[in-house]
């Protein structure tokens, strides 16, 4: 779909080759973790308390929009606890045996990180309950009348679950997490610090004003900020001498069709469709998806959250409505 081509899509498979670079510039410790002050302060206390008691950290659920650093935070927790981390995702764990294999290979106080935990199958989820509560694994041996259940003791461990859809988790699973952290969109100042740190890690010559220009257009999302930084770097190396100032960053981002608000053509297409085709709304999700040629899930999970958070779009019981701010942005009269 169109989503796969978006430079500012928080989750874009076209850029997976750059994950190696992303891992290299990710912070490893809480002290280097920019933004999300409330999360950082709380996790520092929880981690130190667990270390003082020589216990595994309580199970942790991290949720929020894509690209805000859920995986980064999970790795930071493991680094701070000085334990191993094993990483998987909900869709990968198709059978109970897949989860059992991971759990039985954990060492004491290790971290098991499950991304997209809301996509766990009910069968796998059932196995997870006693593992989280009692550090025990219930396994069925054999089939039919001869089948029997055996219990395997597990070492104390920390399950970290990450999701963009906390509401999709079942109540029994959600209630078993002792710590819940929501990641919010980042402030521009925090994103500027992230961009500057990434530039330093990549050995780039970048002025603070250049980092600020990238941060302003990154939709409050570190993953997008780092992706834009790499494209600005390309522009600076080809069109200039490699040095990134505000003017170079502005020209590069304009060339990439990312405007001052961080909108790309899909954001503009969505808002303009509501204003021009549906009289500003309200318009239902099905009609909007058909009008712009995009999947409903992509509209709900990727396009809309930032537009709503910035005050350009409203969700109402009757449908989506373009706000006065959207009309002002495009210079269109209501």
UniProtKB/Swiss-Prot annotation:
Coiled coil: none annotated. Its EC number is 3.6.4.-. ATP binds at residues 25-26, 67, 70-72, 133-135, 176, 186, 223. The keyword Hydrolase applies. Residues 260-334 are annotated as: Head domain (RuvB-H). One of its GO terms (molecular function) is ATP binding. Keywords: ATP-binding, Cytoplasm, DNA damage, DNA recombination, DNA repair, DNA-binding, Hydrolase, Nucleotide-binding. One of its GO terms (biological process) is DNA recombination. It catalyses: ATP + H2O = ADP + phosphate + H(+). The keyword ATP-binding applies. Residues 4-186 are annotated as: Large ATPase domain (RuvB-L). GO terms for cellular component: cytoplasm; Holliday junction resolvase complex. Has 3 domains, the large (RuvB-L) and small ATPase (RuvB-S) domains and the C-terminal head (RuvB-H) domain. The head domain binds DNA, while the ATPase domains jointly bind ATP, ADP or are empty depending on the state of the subunit in the translocation cycle. During a single DNA translocation step the structure of each domain remains the same, but their relative positions change. Homohexamer. Forms an RuvA(8)-RuvB(12)-Holliday junction (HJ) complex. HJ DNA is sandwiched between 2 RuvA tetramers; dsDNA enters through RuvA and exits via RuvB. An RuvB hexamer assembles on each DNA strand where it exits the tetramer. Each RuvB hexamer is contacted by two RuvA subunits (via domain III) on 2 adjacent RuvB subunits; this complex drives branch migration. In the full resolvosome a probable DNA-RuvA(4)-RuvB(12)-RuvC(2) complex forms which resolves the HJ. This is Holliday junction branch migration complex subunit RuvB. It comes from Vibrio parahaemolyticus serotype O3:K6 (strain RIMD 2210633). The lineage of its organism: Bacteria, Pseudomonadati, Pseudomonadota, Gammaproteobacteria, Vibrionales. The gene is ruvB.
């Amino acid at each position: 779909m169109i989503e796969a081509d978006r430079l500012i899509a928080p989750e874009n498979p076209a850029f997976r080759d750059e994950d190696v670079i992303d891992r290299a510039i990710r912070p490893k410790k809480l002290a280097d973790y920019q933004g999300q002050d409330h999360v950082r302060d709380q996790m520092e206390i929880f981690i130190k308390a667990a270390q003082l008691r020589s216990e595994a950290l309580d199970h942790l659920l991290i949720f929020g929009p894509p690209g805000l650093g859920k995986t980064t935070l999970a790795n930071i927790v493991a680094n701070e606890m000085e334990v191993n981390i094993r990483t998987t995702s909900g869709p990968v764990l198709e059978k109970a045996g897949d989860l059992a294999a991971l759990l039985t290979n954990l060492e004491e106080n290790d971290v098991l990180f499950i991304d997209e935990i809301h996509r766990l199958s009910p069968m796998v989820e059932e196995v997870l309950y006693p593992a989280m509560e009692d550090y025990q694994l219930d396994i069925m041996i054999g089939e039919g009348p001869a089948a029997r259940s055996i219990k395997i003791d597990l070492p104390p461990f920390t399950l970290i679950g990450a999701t963009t859809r906390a509401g999709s988790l079942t109540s029994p699973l959600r209630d078993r997490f002792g710590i819940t952290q929501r990641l919010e969109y980042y402030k521009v100042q925090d994103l500027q610090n992230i961009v500057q740190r990434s530039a330093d890690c990549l050995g780039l010559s970048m002025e603070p004003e250049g980092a600020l220009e990238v941060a302003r257009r990154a939709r409050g999302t570190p993953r997008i900020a780092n992706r834009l930084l790499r494209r600005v770097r390309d522009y600076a190396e080809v069109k200039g001498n490699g040095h990134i100032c505000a003017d170079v960053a502005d020209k590069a981002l304009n060339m990439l069709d990312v405007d001052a608000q961080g909108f790309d053509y899909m954001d503009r297409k969505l808002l303009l469709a509501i204003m021009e085709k549906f009289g500003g709304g309200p318009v239902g999700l099905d009609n909007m998806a058909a009008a712009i040629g995009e999947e409903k899930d992509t509209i709900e999970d990727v396009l809309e959250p930032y537009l709503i958070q910035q005050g350009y779009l409203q969700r109402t019981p009757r449908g989506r409505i373009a706000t006065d701010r959207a009309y002002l942005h495009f210079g269109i009269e209501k």
